[in-house]
Structures are given as C-alpha cells and as structure tokens.
C-alpha cells in the first residue's frame, strides 16, 4: 500500500509543481522596476502571416537596468515588432534604431505598482486554488481507497495528513514567491 501512497504523493507533487511553474511564468510577465527579458515573453509579432512569439523573430537583451534591446533578425520585421511591443499593454514605448529596437522602461508610478502588486496577488491566489484542487483530488482518492477497504481509517488519516503537509508546503512556497515579487514590484 505504501507504493500506492508514494505514487499518489508523486502525482500530487507533480501537479502542485505545475501550479508553481505557472505562477512563476505569470510573475515573470509582471513588470518590476528592473529590466527583464521575460517581460516581453507575452508579445506576439505579426510575422509572415501568423502571430509569432517575439523570441522567434528577435533576440531580447538587457544592456542596462532600465533598458531592453530587441535585435530583430529580419529587417522587414522591425515595424511589426515595434507595433507589437507598443500594443502589448505593458505601457512600453519602443524606439527603433535600424534593426535594433531600444525599449526604455519608465519608472513605475505608485498607482501602477499597486496595480501590479494586486495582479501578483491574484496570480498567487489562482495558484493556491489550483493547489487546493489537487489536494481535494488526493483526499477523494484516499476516501475511495477507504470505501473499497483497500486501506483502513487510520492509514487513511495518515495519508491525508501527508497530503495536507504537501499542500501546506506548496502554499507556503507560493506565499514566499508572492512576498518576493511584491518586494520587487514596490522597489523604486
């Protein structure tokens, strides 16, 4: 039966880790005071008749703490790339210079920082909800084992405790990520 528990815990851990990875990806798209190439990950460029991720038509670099540069590989894509960056909703104003596009990051206003912190909180809450959903699935699986008399009540409680500990640890990691991200956002 311990093999079943190990399998269950491994599956739950994998699913909870997936929620954490999603949260990290969402956090990377939130703008902080510092330049980060991941900031432009959500940007899609109209290229060759389809929308392509920016990283498939250009190289993004960070030459300074408040500046991104986008080196477009195809000279004909510069205007489309500038438009995509400008229209991505991040409040950026790209400046083309040949095939190089400079993207200065303006200082965040206090209001914008608060909006970003709220967005980070929403992302974290979404991750917590996902983790709790995984926990619920695990608990239902344990109850199913108990109903089929594959495990006893005591063993079921032990398994449930281990699932709860896994859940608590993951939610603690989410909270730590949120605190760190909010600190980054609020840093002037």
Swiss-Prot record:
One of its GO terms (biological process) is cytoplasmic translational termination. It is found in: Cytoplasm. GO terms for cellular component: cytosol. Coiled coil: none annotated. GO terms for molecular function: ribosomal large subunit binding. Signal peptide: none annotated. The keyword Protein biosynthesis applies. PANTHER family: MITOCHONDRIAL RIBOSOME RECYCLING FACTOR PSEUDO 1, RIBOSOME RECYCLING FACTOR. Belongs to the RRF family. Responsible for the release of ribosomes from messenger RNA at the termination of protein biosynthesis. May increase the efficiency of translation by recycling ribosomes from one round of translation to another. This is Ribosome-recycling factor. The gene is frr.
